[in-house]
Amino acid sequence: MELQGWILHCRAGYEQTLASEATMAAHERDVHGYCRARAQSAYVVFHAPAGDAPLPPQLVFARAGAGLIGELQGLPEGGRAEAIAAALPPAVGSATPWVEHPDSDAGRPLARFCRRFTGPLRHALTQTGVTSGDPQRRLRLLFPDSRHCFAGIGPREGWPSGIPRLRMPRNAPSRSVLKLEEALHRLVPENERPYPGEHAVDLGAAPGGWTWLLRERGLTVTAIDNGPLAPALADDPGVEHQRTDAFRFRPRTEVDWLVCDVVDRPQGIARLMTQWLREEWARAAIFNLKLPMRRPLETVRQALDAVRTTGARAHAAQLYHDREEITVYARRMASRNRP
């Protein structure tokens, strides 16, 4: 099946950054095309007129993506589902439909429509034989408004609109726990995720959201911060709280995990993470980089390049729970994966 480009979700305000990243990725794959990106729309469409686009690669500023198979405009209010089913190419085959909206001020009011439309759409697709609900693939329909949608096809990974369904734990000391939880699901392969008995260092730990999640997973944690931890963590024998500067702390022995949510210039955090990996103080790291207002994509690429000079593999994403920042996962290549 020919793919006419990519449908990409992003955080509102980062459309041009994602468009630049997508254009560069397409050029690296010898795919010719152009992007349509409207400010504050929370999505970007890359068009490949030759119909030779592969499935979209992992892009830092894309929350979710799919291969574009068509754009439908002027959909009727009555019989909308049947019109979509009739317009889809037969080569779509079997896939489970996801009805999505942009995560923007204009797009969020469509959430109710998307929920209610999913049932009629599935019925129409089944009736026409376009799809039979294959759980391994997704037919993604992005609605900028109720009469206009982009249709795409992609693998099962991720969440509708790139928005994870995570609940805030009742006893967690801060909402930052959701950021680390999302990072573990999205960036870290299952056989590389933290597991009981490992040891972690949390730089910039207070009040302790990331430390709390690591303890919930059975790790012991050295929490580094001059500020106080939540009382439950301060009394936890599995947490060692050291009141010192995150940039000066050095571990006594190699640790399994380094996590860092320190607010500092991205270049400074990248240098610190690079040092930890090069000196083999940590096997793996998850850390945030605060983004500058200007040239964020260049800043991210330079930071990832610096981390990779250590021989570590690294990739990053602007998560749903990130704001003006990205989250990076890096692991030394010599580190042994859990079987």
UniProtKB/Swiss-Prot annotation:
Record flagged with keyword rRNA processing: yes
Active site: 290 (proton acceptor)
UniProt keyword terms in alphabetical order: Cytoplasm, Methyltransferase, rRNA processing, S-adenosyl-L-methionine, Transferase
Keyword flag rRNA processing: yes
EC number: 2.1.1.186
Parts forming coiled coils: none
Binding site for S-adenosyl-L-methionine: 176, 206-209, 225, 245, 261
Protein's cellular compartments: Cytoplasm
Reaction catalyzed: cytidine(2498) in 23S rRNA + S-adenosyl-L-methionine = 2'-O-methylcytidine(2498) in 23S rRNA + S-adenosyl-L-homocysteine + H(+)
Family of the protein in this entry: Belongs to the class I-like SAM-binding methyltransferase superfamily. RNA methyltransferase RlmE family. RlmM subfamily.
Matches recorded under NCBIfam families: PRK11760.1
Protein name: Ribosomal RNA large subunit methyltransferase M
Protein species of origin: Halorhodospira halophila (strain DSM 244 / SL1) (Ectothiorhodospira halophila (strain DSM 244 / SL1))
